[in-house]
């Protein structure tokens, strides 16, 4: 079912951004909340079936409108069950967000694929920033497509969790993981061809917009109670275009770092 989603109360546009509304659909429901620990490389017996389950997940993504073969292949390549607690491994390939501890979640597969496909459509970004690395899953998927991935996480416990997961999959040299304030971006590395933000603020931080390369794209959830994905493209030194996409539900975007 498709429905119109109004902009969230209190939302505002950064200078230079122009709105362009589109129809949206609800793609995420209530999020489960439970602590999570790093999963071992073999979560019970799931490893024996994970290839089959990943292929089923990819087929579902196709039916949900994901058509970029690079994204589908990347989703098929990364074992999502290794990024969640062993007790939740049997649910890893469901189209659901799952808790990873610290009141945070791993996004549902469709949302991960949708966000990556949006910033990669008709292009091949060379340098990408992920804001809100969480358990490291989305960074691992990005690393299958993008040559240079920078992922920033504000919560120390999740930073350590992501680092362990990326090391276990031998991706630590392909993803530069940073413990820091994602709202500030990484100005010393910018500009970025694409920025993927995995938490929702009332507005996109200006620091992130400024770190987009000319023609670069940023995708992020925006809003509080009512959220939707927004896709922003830098069109000039002080100008950005904006398009509203699907309605979603993400954890809040917060400033600062947490030890």
Curated annotation (Swiss-Prot):
Its EC number is 2.1.1.77. The gene is pcm. Belongs to the methyltransferase superfamily. L-isoaspartyl/D-aspartyl protein methyltransferase family. One of its GO terms (biological process) is protein repair. This is Protein-L-isoaspartate O-methyltransferase. Keywords: Cytoplasm, Methyltransferase, S-adenosyl-L-methionine, Transferase. Catalyzes the methyl esterification of L-isoaspartyl residues in peptides and proteins that result from spontaneous decomposition of normal L-aspartyl and L-asparaginyl residues. It plays a role in the repair and/or degradation of damaged proteins. Residues 1-25 are annotated as: Disordered. HAMAP family: PIMT. It is found in: Cytoplasm. It catalyses: [protein]-L-isoaspartate + S-adenosyl-L-methionine = [protein]-L-isoaspartate alpha-methyl ester + S-adenosyl-L-homocysteine. CDD domains: AdoMet_MTases (cd02440). The active site is at residue 107. GO terms for molecular function: protein-L-isoaspartate (D-aspartate) O-methyltransferase activity. One of its GO terms (cellular component) is cytoplasm.
């Amino acid at each position: 079912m498709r429905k119109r989603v109004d902009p969230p109360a209190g939302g505002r546009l950064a200078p230079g951004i122009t709105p362009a509304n589109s129809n949206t659909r609800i793609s995420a429901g209530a999020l489960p909340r439970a602590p999570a620990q790093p999963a071992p490389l073999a979560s019970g017996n799931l490893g024996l079936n994970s290839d089959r389950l990943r292929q089923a997940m990819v087929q579902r993504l196709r039916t949900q409108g994901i058509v970029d073969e690079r994204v589908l292949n990347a989703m098929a390549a990364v074992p999502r069950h290794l990024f969640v607690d062993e007790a939740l491994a049997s649910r890893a390939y469901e189209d659901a967000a799952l808790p990873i501890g610290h009141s945070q979640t791993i996004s549902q597969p469709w949302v991960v694929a949708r966000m990556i496909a949006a910033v990669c459509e008709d292009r091949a970004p060379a340098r990408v920033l992920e804001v809100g690395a969480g358990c490291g899953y989305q960074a691992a998927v990005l690393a299958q497509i993008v040559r240079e991935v920078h992922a920033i996480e504000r919560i120390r416990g999740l930073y350590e969790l992501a680092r362990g997961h990326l090391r276990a999959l031998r991706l630590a040299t392909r993803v530069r993981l940073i413990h820091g304030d994602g709202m500030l971006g990484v100005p010393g590395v910018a500009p970025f061809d694409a920025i993927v933000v995995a938490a929702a603020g009332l507005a996109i931080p200006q620091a992130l917009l400024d770190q987009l390369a000319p023609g670069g794209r940023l995708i992020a959830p925006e809003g509080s109670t009512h959220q939707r994905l927004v896709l922003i493209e830098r069109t000039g030194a002080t100008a950005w275009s904006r398009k509203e996409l699907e309605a979603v539900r993400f954890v809040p975007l917060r400033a600062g770092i947490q030890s």
